[in-house]
Amino acid sequence: MRVGISLLTLAPSDLGGSETYARQLTRTLATVGTHEYTAFVPARAKDAAGGLSTVEVRDTPAATRGPSRIPALAISSLRSREVRSELDHLDVVHYALTVPLPRTDLPTVVTLHDVQHRDLPEFFGPGRRSFRRIAYDRAARNAAAVIVTSEFVRGRAVELLELDPTSVHVVPHGVDHSVFSPGDDEREPFILYPARPWPHKNHARLIEAFTRLRETRPRLRLLLTGGGLERLDPLPEGVTSLGSVSTERIVALYRRAACLVFPSLYEGFGLPPLEAMACGCPVAASNTGAIPEVCGDAAVLFDPLDADAIAAAVLEADERSSELREKGLARAAEFGWERTARLHEDVYVAAASEAPVGMPTTS
């Protein structure tokens, strides 16, 4: 079978877990995949598809945020027409980043990473809400198959988008255990939160909890990583922003941190807790969205709306560090990208056997 995978809206270092997913999926399919693959990539991320055969599309502003996103998608749509001839030999097209470009009449598979714009619309401006409803919702409804990352997203998508439950397939993300692995480092008195400062990431409440912890633990520090953290300035004493860091640096931080704290208000999956667990780092995380489903009993869960609960969970994670380390290593071992890739291949076969739906092309 011949499968096209679209990564056309990938913006390096801007999409967080979605970018990790896209890169790991294509890299793994290049190694273990049993079908013939072609990846459609933007010039700005021409290396994103690992070892797959690629079709490069001129750079577009499609991954920009805010009110400019919809006109940017119009530009992307025009440019994606340049590659439509490359679709002729395919059987299925997978929109790994949800946005349905390039358009096609072939059966499509859509990865729907979450439906946050439906569950928490207040976190999106009018332009982004409209964009997601136009691009994400329509793509999912027109797809022969929809891939979601958790039972949580599956339930919300079926309810809110009125999708056929039989067409929605849960395929969890994986962990690259060749990279995320435990070390012999001594734990240090800092807690770690790797996240861009998007509203649902809940930095303000974490910082409030941290200032309370510092009252009794003055040596404790909070380290933040991720792009755009300058928006949080000025930061209180004890809080340090490291900005965007390399994978090697984040692994080193996981191995040394007293714990990972993950206070997100909404996640369709949530990779950092699993990556931290794979490095032997204790985890304290929100009890919302897909996070409890992903973490199982290997993390201390808390109410992310309660700063006192966050602080208490950090203390509990520290007290139970040895237990959580062992539980976390076992939990993370259940998630691997090879399994994720093989489950994707099952969905591609299922989609190809369905009557073509696709996203109609325009002249």
Regions found by a protein language model. Give the residues of each.
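Carbohydrate transferase catalytic cores enriched for Leloir-type hexosyltransferases
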Residues: M1-S363
